[in-house]
Amino acid sequence: MKYDIIGDIHGCFQEFQNLTEKLGYNWSSGLPVHPDQRKLAFVGDITDRGPHSLRMIEIVWELVIHKKEAYYAPGNHCNKLYRFFLGRNVTVAHGLETTVAEYEALPSHKQNIIKEKFITLYEQSPLYHILDEKRVIVCHAGIRQDYIGRRDKKVQTFVLYGDITGEKHADGSPVRRDWAQEYKGQAWIVYGHTPVAEPRFVNQTVNIDTGAVFGGKLTGLRYPEMETISVPSSLPFVAEKFRPIS
């Protein structure tokens, strides 16, 4: 099977449509369909900050749950939105406010539909996907070699948030270790979470979050070709979001 793995979309529907068209997908049915039966996979964070988060929920639900033609690994923003929809006490900030504003603008019956779709999508999706006979792993923030096959709380924190140190940068964002430098596994790890100006290949890992919602690009990785394809963002560029990885 051949896959097109998509980086963090964050509600940037137009960029997602542009990217999938560039990857050869046809939208005549209202959903991206590839003539050669390639499958889409998402590294998570499909919502928040961008203008069309609910549209992305509907599309990914259709592809993953209804048609079973794509793969979705949830990200930290997905986890927070899930907890919001469950009625948990979460802080509506750091991007969640844009999704909540879209949601609250809907009539109540449509709110219920979108909420149930996202809860189903989240609950029926694994923490990460092991694809192509264990040759490639799709996850949100990465995964250590010794964590592959595990799904306990420690692994969940790593996969959703990265290798965090517990310290904070001046802007409040977490300091993360560069786990990819230590990765020695044979399987490719394809992930996002931390915006980079260009797709970042380190050992058998590749970060494809090129900051679409911060004015960078939306990137897809063609697997097994290991070719990256990007489209420019329509949003303003926010330089401080592209911090060097140390």
Swiss-Prot record:
Keywords: GTP-binding, Hydrolase, Nickel, Nucleotide-binding. Its EC number is 3.6.1.17. Signal peptide: none annotated. One of its GO terms (cellular component) is cytoplasm. The keyword Nucleotide-binding applies. It comes from the Bacteria. GO terms for molecular function: bis(5'-nucleosyl)-tetraphosphatase (asymmetrical) activity; GTP binding; nickel cation binding; phosphatase activity. InterPro entries: Ap4A_hydrolase, Bis(5'-nucleosyl)-tetraP_PrpE, Calcineurin-like_PHP_ApaH, Metallo-depent_PP-like, MPP_PrpE-like. It catalyses: P(1),P(4)-bis(5'-guanosyl) tetraphosphate + H2O = GMP + GTP + 2 H(+). PANTHER family: BIS(5'-NUCLEOSYL)-TETRAPHOSPHATASE PRPE [ASYMMETRICAL], METALLOPHOSPHOESTERASE. This is Bis(5'-nucleosyl)-tetraphosphatase PrpE [asymmetrical]. It comes from Bacillus cereus (strain ATCC 14579 / DSM 31 / CCUG 7414 / JCM 2152 / NBRC 15305 / NCIMB 9373 / NCTC 2599 / NRRL B-3711). The gene is prpE.
